[in-house]
Each structure stands twice: as C-alpha cells, then as structure tokens.
Amino acid sequence: MFSRYAFRCAQPLRQSARQYSTEAPKSKSLAPVYVAVGLAGLGVGLYRYQSGAATAEAPAERPKVFTGGDQGWVNLKLSDIEILSHNTKRLRFEFPDKEAVSGLHIASALLTKYSPPDGSKPVIRPYTPTSDEDQPGYLELVVKRYPNGPMSEHLHNMNVDQRLDFKGPLPKYPWEANKHKHICLVAGGTGITPMYQLAREIFKNPEDKTKVTLVFGNVSEEDILLKREFEDLENTYPQRFRAFYVLDNPPEGWTGGKGYITKELLKTVLPEPKEENIKIFVCGPPGMYKAISGPKVSPKDQGELTGILKELGYSKDQVYKF
C-alpha cells in the first residue's frame, strides 16, 4: 500500500588555491626594505578595504516583532483573507515595520487575545503561524472554524483592517539541524500547523538531512489543511519525506487510510522503537492524544506515555506532545 524510497546524498564542493614564491635580490641595497615596508602598508590597506567591504555587504539583522519576556501584547492589523475551504481561512496580519520578521523560532507559537465587546473575560488561544519565520512584513494563520469555539469564530468573523492582539513567542520543542535521524509527525485536524512549521524548517536547510514521515488524520478530504504544501515537499524530496492521510469519511475512490489512525497503520509506517535517534511528535484533538500517546498534564509537563505508541514499544523520551 505504501511505497518506500532510497535516500539521496549531496556531493561536497571542492576549492583549490595556488601559491606563489619569489627570490630575494642579492644586492645589499636598502631598496628591498622600502619595498617590503611599502608592500606591508599596501597589505594593511587592502585588508582594511576588504574588511570594510565585507562588513558593508553583510546583511543587517532584521528587527523582530515578538521578543518575549515582558514585551506584552502586540496589536496587528488583518491585511488579507483567503478562503481555503468551507470552514478554513488563511489570515494575514501585517507588521508595523515592513522589514521586520516575527522573531519566532522552531518550534514556537503565539498567543492570540480577543476581548468581547460585552466586557466579559478575554479569550486567549495559542496558534502556530504557517508563514516562514524569516518572512518580513507579516505573519499568516490557517484557522479552522469550530462550533462554539470563541476564538476561531471571532477570527472567521474578522474583516480586513480589523486588529488582533498577539504575544510570544511561546517556546515548544527546540530544533537544530540533524537533531534526529528520523522524525514522525502524527497529527489530527489543526494540530498540523506545528508539524508543518517543523517540516518546513528541516527542508529549507540544505545541511539538515532528517527524514520525515507524516501521518495526518481528518474528517473529510476538504479538511486536509496545507495539503498542497505537503505535496510540494513530497515532490521535491521524495527520498526523505512521506505523507499518509487518514479520513473518517473518505470519498469514493479514496486510496489512503480510512477511519481513525490505527495501531496497525503506525506499526507499518513508523520506524521501529529500537532504531536510534528517532522522535515522534503528536498534535491534535484530545481524543487523538488519548488514543495515540496520552494527554499532556500542562504546557511544561508532557505527562506519561500511554496509548498506541506505548503499546508499540516506544519510550517516553522518544515522543513529544505539542
């Protein structure tokens, strides 16, 4: 049912240099001394010139919108709305400084805050932007509307030029290139956004050779968020990225998984627990956490590992719950 691929290797570039030698004159004249001093001065001047040029050419670090700590809330204007499906929108919020970047790192999220007009308690929810952390001028959220979800309903009711409060970044799992040999992303619904953030970071870094397997569960095909982006990764990196989709209500002719993410599916597509340096990330609704890995106790407490991953023999250290 699933195909497997061989992994590519990148070829290193080589550089060469040539050295020159000169023969000192036999004359006892002071001319060589003057020449040496002159050349030394020329060398210093050339070094200073080149150093100055290098400094001038080095790109200045862009200002960051979110700096954490005691910064407080940052109010941003909604500048663009894109309808992705019957219940999902992509919302773009612009930064006051067009040259600024978000200041987020991998993996991290932002808090959003909405104050109801009736003066009731503010609604605060975390969201992981889907725009690149190095993108200047704006950030984007992909938001699915949930019944009785006050923040998602508010975001879907917003119009261009209205404003929303943000705060962050909220640190999650610190990533660095090649931290793990193979990672697996098990996601449900909007739990895909931190997974996409992590996968995008891995594949945009040519030094990072991490393999990535995605298992993504949804109700219907229309609910698969960021599918185009993941298909682009599959087409560009077929030897390092695989995606498996599971639907509760699949359409006729669907060739992916059906129903829920099962123990049999995960046993088939995930690396074995005995493999070295692997990590499994889980993010989704409460029911999925309960079935796959067990819930988190708090943002800082991962809780015990239970569910399917425990039954398959994975250890607590091999699993991270967003």
From Swiss-Prot:
> What EC number(s) does the entry state?
1.6.2.2
Cellular localisation: Mitochondrion outer membrane
Entry keyword annotation includes Transmembrane:
yes
Q: Which metal ions or organic cofactors does this protein require, according to UniProt?
A: FAD
- Ranges that cross the membrane: 30-46
- Name the Gene Ontology molecular function terms of this record: cytochrome-b5 reductase activity, acting on NAD(P)H
Question: Keywords for this entry?
Answer: FAD, Flavoprotein, Membrane, Mitochondrion, Mitochondrion outer membrane, NAD, Oxidoreductase, Transmembrane, Transmembrane helix
- What enzyme category does the UniProt record give? oxidoreductase
Gene Ontology cellular component annotations, sorted alphabetically? mitochondrial outer membrane
* List of residues binding FAD: 179-214
Any Gene Ontology biological process: ergosterol biosynthetic process
Where is this chain primarily localised? mitochondrion
Q: Where is the FAD-binding FR-type domain?
A: 71-176
**What InterPro entries has UniProt attached to this entry?**
CBR-like, Cbr1-like_FAD-bd_dom, FAD-bd_FR_type, Flavoprot_Pyr_Nucl_cyt_Rdtase, FNR_nucleotide-bd, OxRdtase_FAD/NAD-bd, Riboflavin_synthase-like_b-brl
Reaction catalysed by this chain? 2 Fe(III)-[cytochrome b5] + NADH = 2 Fe(II)-[cytochrome b5] + NAD(+) + H(+)
Q: Topology in the membrane? A: Single-pass membrane protein
Q: What does this protein do?
A: May mediate the reduction of outer membrane cytochrome b5.
UniProt-listed PANTHER family: NADH-CYTOCHROME B5 REDUCTASE, NADH-CYTOCHROME B5 REDUCTASE 2
Q: Record's family?
A: Belongs to the flavoprotein pyridine nucleotide cytochrome reductase family.
Q: What is this protein called?
A: NADH-cytochrome b5 reductase 2
Q: Which organism is it from?
A: Emericella nidulans (strain FGSC A4 / ATCC 38163 / CBS 112.46 / NRRL 194 / M139)
